[in-house]
């Protein structure tokens, strides 16, 4: 079902209003006023079924994912810190300070899968536009893209540690023979057996 909206808090007469305890000039507050939140409702509306339980508010989910990536946090960490931070709560569309987590952190992964690459691209596009509008980023800074391939999927044999240890030992033994260095024991056979045992343990997921 289409997302719900955060409670307006009309019945929360004895709770603290966020706009009364935050600095309106704080960067996140100013950014919240620039981001076109309604744009996400329109962009993601087609990803929801017409029936069923109402989904979490789009602004809440978008805001949590923005904070998650800006501060390099896990899903669990961003939800935990959200409860402690009035600026984060205001950014996600709440009017009154909340003392409990707005969602279960486990719901963030299904939401990402639901909006897919197209939705994530929309998030990135809106973030860049907001950064340019607020002066956080300059147009020339977007002319070049730095790509980090350290997490690029590669065909690496597992377990890598035991295999590397074995190769290092074999290389040292070869160099020792090449330079005429006599070793009382090379441990080559023992290392091979240990590597095989490590692979078996890894296959059985026993460590």
Swiss-Prot record:
Keywords: Plasmid. InterPro entries: Transpos_IS5-like, Transposase_InsH_N. It holds the Pfam family DUF772. This is Uncharacterized protein ORF8 in nfe locus. The lineage of its organism: Bacteria, Pseudomonadati, Pseudomonadota, Alphaproteobacteria, Hyphomicrobiales.
């Amino acid at each position: 079902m289409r997302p719900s909206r955060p409670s307006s808090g009309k019945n929360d007469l004895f709770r603290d209003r966020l706009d009364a305890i935050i600095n309106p000039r704080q960067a996140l507050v100013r950014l919240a006023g620039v981001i076109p939140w309604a744009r996400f409702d329109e962009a993601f509306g087609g990803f929801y079924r017409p029936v069923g339980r109402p989904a979490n508010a789009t602004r809440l989910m978008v805001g949590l994912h923005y904070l998650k990536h800006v501060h390099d946090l896990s899903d669990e960490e961003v939800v935990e810190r959200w409860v402690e931070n009035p600026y984060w709560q205001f950014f996600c569309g709440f009017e009154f300070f909340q003392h409990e987590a707005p969602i279960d952190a486990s719901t963030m992964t299904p939401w990402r899968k639901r909006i897919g690459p197209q939705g994530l691209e929309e998030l990135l596009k809106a973030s860049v536009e907001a950064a340019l509008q607020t002066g956080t980023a300059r147009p020339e800074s977007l002319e070049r893209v730095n790509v980090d391939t350290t997490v690029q999927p590669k065909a690496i044999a597992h377990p890598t540690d035991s295999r590397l240890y074995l190769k290092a030992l074999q290389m040292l033994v070869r160099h020792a023979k090449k330079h005429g260095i006599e070793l009382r024991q090379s441990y080559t056979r023992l290392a091979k057996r240990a590597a095989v045992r490590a692979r078996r343990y890894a296959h059985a997921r026993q460590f």
